[in-house]
């Protein structure tokens, strides 16, 4: 069992088992067993809303006991809470599978995390580059040159 805190400072326990997998299937029409194929993990990492929906379904019994609706849960999920919750879900999902599949899923998850870190580093490097600054400045100059070139006459402006 993995835990995370939402932005309302509530602690949630994520437990992936047959019951929670069936609940996610029933409520969201998402089969967590498809994690083995890899596409589901990519979707869970790439779409911050999807893991929140899945986690709510996984934690639904706890949410119902606390009187927390799907909407209230969603309002308490943003930023780091989503990342922590997604990590808890993915780790629990990996641990659900038997040893052979679990090893493959751990490798796939590690690859995706490495790829994500590399992507962030490349984007950060690009944003810090003087070349980007020069390109943006050149585009701004083009806009400045073209904006003063054609002025509408006051006759073409409708009077209210």
What are the residue ranges of the model-derived segments?
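Glycine-centered positions within short beta-strands or beta-hairpins
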Residues: 6-10
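Charged interaction scaffolds used for protein-protein
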Residues: 1-3, 26, 30-49, 61-160
């Amino acid at each position: 069992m993995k835990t995370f805190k939402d932005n309302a400072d509530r602690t949630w326990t994520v437990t992936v088992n047959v019951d929670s997998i069936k609940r996610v299937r029933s409520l969201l029409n998402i089969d967590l067993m498809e994690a083995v194929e890899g596409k589901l993990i990519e979707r869970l990492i790439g779409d911050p809303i999807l893991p929140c929906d899945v986690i709510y379904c996984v934690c639904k019994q706890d949410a119902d006991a606390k009187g927390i609706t799907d909407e209230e849960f969603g309002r308490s999920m943003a930023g780091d809470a989503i990342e922590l919750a997604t990590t808890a879900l993915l780790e629990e999902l990996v641990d659900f599978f038997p040893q052979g599949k679990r090893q493959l899923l751990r490798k796939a998850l590690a690859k995706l995390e490495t790829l994500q870190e590399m992507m962030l580093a490349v984007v950060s490097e690009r944003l810090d580059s003087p070349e980007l600054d020069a390109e943006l400045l050149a585009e701004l100059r083009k806009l400045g040159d073209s904006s003063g070139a054609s002025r509408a006459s006051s006759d073409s402006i409708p009077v209210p």
